[in-house]
Amino acid sequence: MKGKQNPVEKEWAAVVKAEERFLRHAMPARTAGWQEKITRYVPQKLETTLHAAFYKAFELIFDRGTPVIEKTYQREKKEQNYKINAYTAEVRDTRHALRAFGREAGASRNLNLAVSAVEGVGMGFFGLGLPDIPLFLGVLLKSIYEVALSYGYTYDTQEEQIFILKLIETALSHGEQLAQNNMELNLWMREERTFSISRNEQIRRTSDALAGELLYLKFVQGLPVVGMVGGVSDMVYQKRISDYA
């Protein structure tokens, strides 16, 4: 007979179940019918162009853009909130106290999803698909940064940046690649391993994943007015990545 789980064990079990649900849903690759219908209209060079745009945007943000992103939230306050939540969880030892970390992260995530939706639809209305990419990544990384701070983690080192990039790639993966990437991330967290891949190479892989996944939606977003539909994809994919994070 199993003994009664303590609050930490119960919360961990809930986290594991949420991860398993995500993996089950994301494992099979799905292609919408409308994507197949517009395939012949999508320029052959668009995926290469998207990859280059994502790659340059990641480089720019990691090298010079993080301080700009941090101006949109109070890092010190979030770090202080984590310390308060950690102390409360240690003293009270209840699931409600433990869930304070998730509530803090969830509030930031929901706000960023709303910003992403407005930004994506607005750019789509004017048919601006490619110029939307730095904004899309900026909001996405802001959301991940805030989640990290809510749980007491940082994002300043290249190793942490590689982790974030790998997380984004994994959230967009399917099948064996999803399982492999997820295992690598879990090992990194549990055993404090280091990644053998360079940051530039991981940027390339993550840019490949984003370009492949968003190819059709960015094509649609590049069409005036109709692009509003493609613009909604910014929020959809940010939610998918945030859910995995």
Predicted features along the sequence, with ranges:
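Hydrophobic alpha-helical membrane segments of integral membrane proteins
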Residues: D132-L137, V229
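Transmembrane alpha-helix interface/packing and boundary motifs in multi-pass membrane proteins
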Residues: E119-P131, V225
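Structural signature of FAD isoalloxazine-binding scaffolds in flavoprotein oxidoreductases
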Residues: V139-S143
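Terminal, membrane-proximal amphipathic helices
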Residues: M1-V118, Y145-A245
